[in-house]
Amino acid sequence: MSLLTEVETPIRNEWGCRCNDSSDPLVVAASIIGILHLILWILDRLFFKCIYRFFEHGLKRGPSTEGVPESMREEYRKEQQSAVDADDSHFVSIELE
């Protein structure tokens, strides 16, 4: 028998868990957090288009207008547009020659 074979052959005791304190609450908490992180990462990679599309359109919608009279909706739209128009005047256009 060669020396290499003897080195690679595992002893039965080495197959067991060497962590005697695996019931430590910190180890358990770290394991749970690691598993949850892995699950969330997998879900994010699988459904990232749906998730980010929802957030992108959800943030652009603005406040809900249910139960608001049409005249108040129109007034709100005009205020929003005037705020956008006022912000446009702050930009400086630079022309390159």
Curated annotation (Swiss-Prot):
When the channel is activated, one or more imidazole moieties of His-37 probably become bi-protonated. The record marks S71 as: Not phosphorylated. Belongs to the influenza viruses matrix protein M2 family. The record marks W41 as: Seems to be involved in pH gating. Glycans are attached at N20. The record marks H37 as: Essential for channel activity, possibly by being protonated during channel activation, and by forming the channel gate and the selective filter. Residues 71-80 have a biased composition (Basic and acidic residues). InterPro entries: Flu_M2. Residues 60-88 are annotated as: Disordered. The keyword Heme does not apply. A lipid is attached at C50 (S-palmitoyl cysteine). The lineage of its organism: Viruses, Riboviria, Orthornavirae, Negarnaviricota, Polyploviricotina. Its main location: virion. Changing V27T: Increased channel activity. It comes from Influenza A virus (strain A/Udorn/1972 H3N2). One of its GO terms (cellular component) is host cell plasma membrane. Changing V27S: Increased channel activity. Resistant to amantatine. The keyword Phosphoprotein applies. Keywords: Disulfide bond, Glycoprotein, Host cell membrane, Host membrane, Host-virus interaction, Hydrogen ion transport, Inhibition of host autophagy by virus, Ion channel, Ion transport, Lipoprotein, Membrane, Palmitate, Phosphoprotein, Signal-anchor, Transmembrane, Transmembrane helix, Transport, Viral ion channel, Virion. This is Matrix protein 2. It is a single-pass type III membrane protein. One of its GO terms (biological process) is symbiont-mediated suppression of host autophagy.
